[in-house]
């Protein structure tokens, strides 16, 4: 079964019904449904989308049910199987009358039939849903809740409370890093959400750059996840993906409360480097040459929505004896009478490796470079600035695993 909304997109150019709506791409819908265990696609399971827009979640589930061996065993006749699925297994609450009509036309032989796709108000509440479906609960709740006004965690909680087995949602990833007592317009604080919902998460897929999924801006990235209503997990499988490349090249299972993010991966790299001696800034106040930079430093919030960033502004060498202007520049506290040493220093701090370690000290800040900015940056293995450094050289010298190299090169822009 193909969704009618895709045909509307193809022939009319409509991408969504209103400016506030975010339509989930089909490939993401498929990936989200993949999180569910195969045994859930059986004749007794019920599936509910609490925020139906395109209908893609319900249509994807319909296709999985039609192809399920358990369903074919119970309903060998294809028409009987179809009838059972649309009458007994698929339920949805639409975000608008238009969305309801489009999805009904896709699912039902009679597009005017209400079926199990309801719309009574655009103000979605637990009471409204229970009233529309006679206090029914569902084995699986899946969808893309509204993001406006920071109410997404309330919708996740709603899905959790309406599900008897699993809840699969795609939402902004702010819940990973927000302060415990923070709330925007939601009833829950992020701390309450993490305490109640996060222990039930068994699988999280995180996109730090929202534009890898949606054509919208979300400064905290986007994630989708499987919530197991009946089980609590000490650890959770977490996958970070950017530009269609996985940060984790093997299955990683860890505590979700670690707030899996580039900050955590940065900490892993720092721990991996261990007690290597750190770079020391030569103030060189009386030296002829000074390495200078402007004040624009950008931390790791960066990478969203614009993708890789430089993280450290361009540095220049100022010849103090020639009276060159320092206007608009701030010192990096490095000086030398040997211009070649300054050039070597600049090549070192311009590597992606060093700029990544600078970025994780900033944690989203923008400000002036200080000696603290470089606190995670190791000194060159030789201890000298005597040649032009490259990333390949440093990766080899510090024996950096490929999984960390992939992270660095995905989020820090090459400087040419």
Which residues does each PLM region occupy?
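SAM-dependent methyltransferase catalytic region
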Residues: 1-213, 219-234, 238
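C-terminal substrate-recognition regions of SAM-dependent nucleic acid methyltransferases
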Residues: 15, 19, 27, 202-203, ...
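Short acidic/histidine-centered micro-motifs embedded in hydrophobic/aromatic stretches
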Residues: 411
């Amino acid at each position: 079964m193909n969704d009618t909304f895709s045909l509307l997109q193809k022939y009319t150019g409509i991408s969504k019904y209103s400016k506030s709506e975010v339509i989930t791409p089909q490939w993401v819908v498929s990936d989200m449904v993949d999180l569910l265990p195969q045994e859930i696609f059986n004749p007794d399971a019920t599936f509910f989308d609490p925020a139906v827009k395109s209908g893609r979640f319900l249509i994807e589930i319909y296709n999985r049910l039609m192809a399920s061996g358990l369903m074919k065993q119970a309903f060998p006749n294809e028409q009987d199987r179809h009838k059972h699925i649309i009458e007994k297994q698929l339920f949805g609450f639409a975000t608008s009358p238009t969305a309801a009509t489009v999805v009904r036309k896709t699912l039902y032989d009679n597009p005017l039939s209400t079926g199990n796709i309801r719309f009574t108000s655009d103000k979605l509440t637990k009471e409204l849903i229970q009233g529309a479906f006679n206090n029914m609960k569902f084995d699986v709740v899946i969808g893309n809740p509204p993001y406006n006004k920071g109410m997404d965690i309330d919708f996740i909680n709603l899905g959790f409370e309406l599900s008897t087995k699993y809840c699969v949602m795609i939402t902004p990833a702010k819940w990973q890093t927000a302060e415990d007592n923070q709330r925007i317009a939601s009833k829950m604080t992020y701390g309450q959400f993490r305490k109640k919902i996060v222990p039930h998460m068994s699988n999280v897929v995180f996109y730090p750059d929202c534009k890898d999924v949606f054509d919208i801006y979300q400064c905290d990235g986007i994630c989708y996840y499987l919530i197991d209503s009946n089980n609590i997990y000490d650890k959770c499988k977490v996958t970070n993906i950017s530009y269609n490349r996985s940060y984790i090249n093997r299955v990683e299972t860890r505590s979700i409360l670690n707030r899996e993010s580039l900050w955590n991966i940065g900490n892993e790299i720092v721990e991996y480097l261990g007690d290597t001696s750190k770079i020391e800034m030569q103030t060189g106040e009386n030296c002829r040459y000074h390495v200078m930079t402007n004040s624009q430093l950008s931390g790791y919030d960066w990478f969203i929505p614009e993708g890789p960033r430089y993280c450290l502004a361009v540095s220049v060498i100022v010849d103090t004896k020639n009276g060159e202007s320092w206007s608009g520049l701030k010192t990096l506290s490095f000086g030398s009478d040997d211009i070649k040493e300054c050039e070597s220093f600049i090549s070192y701090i311009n590597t992606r490796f060093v700029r990544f370690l600078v970025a994780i000290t900033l944690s989203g800040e923008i400000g002036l470079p200080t000696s603290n900015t470089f606190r995670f940056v190791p000194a060159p293995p030789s201890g000298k600035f005597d040649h032009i450094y490259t990333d390949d050289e440093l990766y080899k010298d510090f024996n950096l695993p490929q999984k960390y190299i992939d992270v660095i090169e995905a989020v820090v822009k090459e400087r040419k």
